[in-house]
Swiss-Prot record:
Top class in the EC scheme: transferase
Record-annotated site: Interaction with substrate tRNA: T105
Signal peptide: none
Family, similarity comment: Belongs to the IPP transferase family.
Highest rank taxon of the organism: Bacteria
EC code: 2.5.1.75
Binding, ATP: G14, P15, T16, A17, S18, G19, K20, T21
Subunit structure: Monomer.
InterPro entries reported in the protein's UniProt record: Dimethylallyltransferase (IPR039657), IPT (IPR018022), P-loop_NTPase (IPR027417)
Positions of the UniProt region annotated as Interaction with substrate tRNA: 39-42, 163-167, 243-248
Name of the protein in question: tRNA dimethylallyltransferase
Keywords, in A-Z order: ATP-binding, Magnesium, Nucleotide-binding, Transferase, tRNA processing
Amino acid sequence: MPIQINKTVIFLMGPTASGKTNLAIKLSQQFKTRLISVDSALIYKGMNIGTAKPDKATLKKYPHYLINICSPESSYSVFDFIRDANKQIKTAFAKNELPILVGGTSFYFHVLEHGLSNLPESSTKSKEKFNQLLRNKGTIKLHQDLKKIDPQAANKIHPNDSQRIIRALEVFNLSGKTISELQGNKKPIIDYPIKKIILMPKRNELHTKIETRFLLMMKNGFLNEVQHLKQNPNLHQNLSSIRCVGYRQAWQYLNGKIDKTEMIEKIIIATRQLCKRQITWLKSEKYALVLNNSNLAKAVTFINS
């Protein structure tokens, strides 16, 4: 099988539980690749079971970059991702590797292809300031504050989306302009051709797999994983890491807010809702190879075309 040497970036996208990792590994057996994770949950250390992170043996044999790169209490912005992804893409080309960006965080893919607005960059001091504000006031109150400053942005951001809320407030604090004002004038982050592969199984298959996969997570010690996280005094339910699907609901259960049956039901429903949002976004993607299963032969032909 020929090695892809042209400077082309592969986007391997799909909703949660669609088999992206499996196909990425199969492609690594066909090409000299660099697998780069595009997943805002897989970045966190110690959050393995609930994020469906590839196991240690798999990661050792088929390294995935941008996995396990920060602690759950850390803040990791889209700017951090752009910096890290760009570095990995350049490294791939320097080593004559095919960069395959694989994951389910739609926003990250969108930014790499279409660019980001000319927003002021965050700093460690600024991040600390707004994370402290989040701890003191809570997500809902900060969303109300944002609505007074920038109602347009507030209407687009869910009241529980703490990361985007504090980023919008931070932008206003740093620039004196709202994030809505500054959005515009975008240019692509990636200057190379992009080939997109989208895994899109039937919805009923995804729903079944989501439930089966989560029940397996429970058997594999998901609650023990969350209990271990709760022992870290720096972690709380307003952090982006703990707001990941599954962890938020398990945190509520371990705090006695909901019972186990309700927790399981809430996690499965939330995961299916995430899946629906991902599918909606993926349907708007153009010029992509869409597969309803991990069809390796079609993917290889597409990459080589």
